Amino acid sequence: MQKVSFTENLDFNDKKMVTQVLLETSFSKEIRILLRKGQLMKEHKAPFPIIVHIVEGNIDFGVEGTVHVLKQGDMITLAANIPHDLLAKSDSIVRLTLSKLDAAERVEKVVANS
């Protein structure tokens, strides 16, 4: 058993998004992404299905050119290889669930290139 908090020990950065793997299980990786208002994660794809959960804040979640407004508590799922982007409309905490087969380093590269 493991216990983590997505809302404790927050270290937002005004210059870049902050990612942290908070939990890894036999089937998934749970990543926290901290975004300041206005920060953009440029369009990218995931090689496996993902789940995005807005823990706090508001995000414009672009999927193949269509913007979906996500607010605190909302979740969205995407199949593999679907282009998507995120724009923080307010300071936001995002929970990203990756397949165990996916790499957290891939997410870090997307953030670094955004």
Model-inferred region functions:
Residues 1-27, 111-114:
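A short, N-terminal "cap"/entry segment at the start of jelly-roll beta-barrel domains
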Residues 80-103:
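Ligand-binding loop in jelly-roll beta-barrel domains
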Residues 48-59, 64:
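Glycine- and acidic-residue-biased ligand/ion/polar-headgroup-sensing regions
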Residues 29-46:
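Conserved short histidine dyad/triad with adjacent acidic residue
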Residues 65-80:
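Short acidic-glycine-tyrosine-enriched beta hairpin
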Residues 55-56, 71-72, 90:
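A cytosolic small-molecule/anion-sensing beta-strand core signal
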